[in-house]
Design a protein with these regions (language model features):
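S-adenosylmethionine
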Residues: 1-431
Length: 431
């Protein structure tokens, strides 16, 4: 266990110093090349779990220490161990013993004794500490909801009826949802295939299948052959809301990693241009399309400045955002984001919207999409755009009865729940 704790502590420490977990975790794993697959898997679980509940775990650690430690790695090791003692099924004695061993490997002479003392104090005083945290107005909400205070305050203001449920969803494990390629099968048939292979799943309409337990894509029947793709249920709305028709010219303006790109091509025979400003990420789009045996014109470019001689009938603008609606998938986001980042994203989004509008044909439709739950990036952004473009009209989102039943949507905002992430959709038509 101590190897997994050590790897997780390296990853958590790097995230708390500003690194993205998608970069920090592989780097931490690479520092222990002899770790077994089980140790590597456990390290990933501990990294995600510690950051998912960092607000709570850190509140306990602050109460246990007289002052913050100067050693970031030992701090992170304590955070990982306290997370285990609070949320993991591992035996308390084993967690403490292995954390002390990990501290010894980390080399500071004082580390073993301090880690041992802090963790044993935690076990003795856990109930008292919980009451102290609950009574401390400076940290009680951050500890209870494991989100930054500014984030909690914003959700209280913008979602007075839903803020607690949104925060709870943000701390939950995300579902694994598949999109069935309608050219090859449908959700009901595919669920029957899964049942024959003892994989429990639920179909959420014609295309979406939610697995009871996540599995590796290598174990997903038909994935390699393009029968299914991994895509959140809420994200599957994008291609459907575009109102696609045969032979249309389509621009997917922020295409990587290509989930929505592939979905568009599954639904209609169209001429699609996939644009992204990152060439390496565009390679992922190419890989996705190859698996689906679909073709698009892939272009590297910035959606805020991109020019094209073509006027497009449909444009998908899945713009950069705070990603506040997908924090359960990216647990580091809530601790890396700052409230000031919202305004920076809004400037970028406005520039993209304004530029793409020039590429849209008359009577064409542009679907504006974010994976954010902050209104500044969503309807407020659209309202500002509409004030400046009198040839733009926001259309109602037309959902099928099946989608209406399963999707929790409020004025274009998908409120994150156990079935789907938090996304925003606005469909704009050019007159």
């Amino acid at each position: 266990m101590y190897i997994s704790q050590q790897i997780a502590a390296i990853a958590v420490s790097n995230v708390l110093s500003g690194r993205n977990l998608t970069l920090a975790l592989p780097e931490a794993l690479n520092s222990y090349p002899k770790a077994t697959p089980q140790q590597r898997g456990a390290a990933a679980d501990l990294s995600y779990g510690t950051l998912r509940f960092y607000g709570e775990v850190n509140a306990y650690l602050e109460k246990l220490l007289e002052k913050p430690l100067s050693n970031a790695h030992i701090t992170a090791l304590l955070l990982v161990a306290i997370y285990q003692l609070l949320h993991d099924k591992a035996d308390d004695f084993t967690v403490v013993n292995q954390a002390v061993k990990a501290a010894g490997d980390a080399k500071p002479r004082w580390a073993k004794g301090l880690v041992n003392g802090v963790l044993r104090n935690f076990l003795r005083q856990k109930d008292v500490l919980a009451e102290q945290i609950k009574a401390d107005p400076k940290i009680n909400e951050v500890a209870l909801y494991s989100h930054p205070q500014w984030w909690i305050n914003k959700l209280k203001n913008q979602y007075p009826q839903h803020w607690q449920a949104i925060l709870a969803t943000g701390n939950a494990h995300p579902p694994m949802t598949l999109r069935v390629n309608v050219q090859q099968s449908n959700a009901q048939e595919y669920c029957q295939l899964l049942a024959r292979q003892d994989i429990e799943a639920t179909h959420l309409g014609d295309q979406a299948v939610m697995l009871a337990k996540p599995i590796s894509v290598e174990q997903v029947p038909g994935f390699a052959d393009g029968v299914v793709s991994v895509q959140d249920y809420g994200a599957q709305l994008a291609a459907q809301l575009l109102d696609l028709q045969e032979n249309m010219r389509i621009l997917d303006a922020c295409a990587a990693p290509g989930g929505k790109t592939g979905h568009i091509l599954e639904l209609a025979d169209v001429a699609l241009t996939a644009l992204d400003n990152d060439a390496s990420r565009l390679n992922r789009v190419a890989s996705n399309l190859a698996r689906l045996q679909k073709v698009a014109d892939l272009k590297v470019g910035d959606a805020a400045t991109y020019k094209d001689n073509t006027q497009f009938d449909r444009i998908l603008a899945d713009v950069p955002c705070t990603a506040s609606g997908i924090v359960r998938r990216h647990v580091d986001i809530k601790w890396l984001r700052r409230e000031a980042d919202i305004a920076k994203f809004c400037v970028q989004q406005a520039a993209i919207l304004s530029n793409l509008w020039q590429l849209l044909a008359k009577d064409g439709k542009l679907l504006y999409v974010t994976c954010s739950i902050f209104n500044e990036e969503n309807q407020q952004q659209v309202d500002q755009f509409l004030l400046k473009h009198n040839d733009a009209t926001q259309l109602p989102l037309l959902l099928t009865n099946e989608l209406e039943k399963n999707i929790q949507i409020q004025h274009g905002q998908l409120i994150p729940n156990h079935q789907h992430d938090g996304l925003f959709y606005a469909l704009l038509q050019k007159s």
